[in-house]
Amino acid sequence: MFQADLLAVKRILVTGGGTGLGFSMARRFKELGAVPVICGRRPDVLADAASQLGGAETHVCDIRDPAAVDAMLDAIWQTGPLDGLVNNAAGNFIARSETLSPRAVDAVLGIVLHGTAYATLGCGRRWLDAGHKATVLSIVTTYAWTGSAYVVPSAMAKAGILAMTRSLAVEWGGRDVRLNAIAPGPFPTPGAWERLVPKPEMVDMIEKRNPLGRPGAHIELANLASYLMSDHSAYVNGEVVTIDGGEWLKGAGEFNFIGDMMTEEDWDALRKGGAR
């Protein structure tokens, strides 16, 4: 699909890059010539990911801590600047909102919103000071603009990231720093998937409500991320690209649900009644 050197020698930091979509993106970046740098909170997970990647620079970092983020970026910059940042680290769970404690809210906002801001602003300051061309890609969700029940802290955080992306795209675009976002639909990952889809019948429901009838494959998102991190997307700035098989569009249409409820007999009855 892409030339083998699409991301040649680009140094790209992927937060939460030890598992899930973060790892899948880091792996694809490396296949396309990039030098991936991954960070996370668990040394053993990072070591295993680096081994699977055939070698990668790793940093143990709790991105909720601005001092830790700054120290990590200082360490990374000792061997040269980054060329890109992928804000992927996240935390989420389903809950009735009235049961959420302040600690539960802060747990999500700290990782998703604050951590993303700390990493983006920290990289941005260094790039702008040096006049270094760079790209930021943030992983959001389709409910960043629609909202969603039962994941309110996540919806708040992702909406904030999208606002940051669009704002800084304007502020920094003229200084060679682009910012974009990807809004994924369902992409199963171990751990996170079980927390968000706790009942087997919910998996079937998710697949049925998707126009393509399936969840996304990690390589599909990783390929999109690779394009947005590459120089081929140099004129794409301040955008959010949805990759969900049309799921949110189906949910938004007033009568989209009808196709799942009507039988052939129902349609025949409508035609016989004069509907066109």
Label each PLM-derived region with a short phrase.
Residues 96-109, 206:
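Substrate-binding pocket helix/loop in short-chain dehydrogenase/reductase
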Residues 174, 184-209, 250-276:
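A glycine/serine/threonine-rich, flexible loop-to-helix segment
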